[in-house]
Amino acid sequence: MSSLDKTMYFDFDNDSVKDVHDTLTTVYEALQEKGYNPINQIVGYLLSGDPAYIPRLKDARNLIRKHQRDEIIEELVKSYLKADKDVDA
């Protein structure tokens, strides 16, 4: 079996969960304060990786860049599934 046929495994430190939550909260507040639609801007950043979607206000741009985008997406998916169903994520 070639390495391309194997499933990749991601595992993040549990301490990063709170950090990601705190970062997203700060970013959300900064975007609201600037008058942007926070959800659209965060999605734009996550899809493109372009930090221009995130303002410098409250150091939001630097904070969000401390996390890998896949780490943020993983925490968002876990949070969604826990809220939607009683899933052990």
From Swiss-Prot:
Transmembrane segments: none
InterPro entries (alphabetical): IreB
Family: Belongs to the UPF0297 family.
Organism of provenance: Lactiplantibacillus plantarum (strain ATCC BAA-793 / NCIMB 8826 / WCFS1)
HAMAP family: UPF0297
PANTHER family: UPF0297 PROTEIN YRZL
Protein name from the UniProt record: UPF0297 protein lp_2275
Domain of life (superkingdom): Bacteria
Pfam assignment, any one: IreB
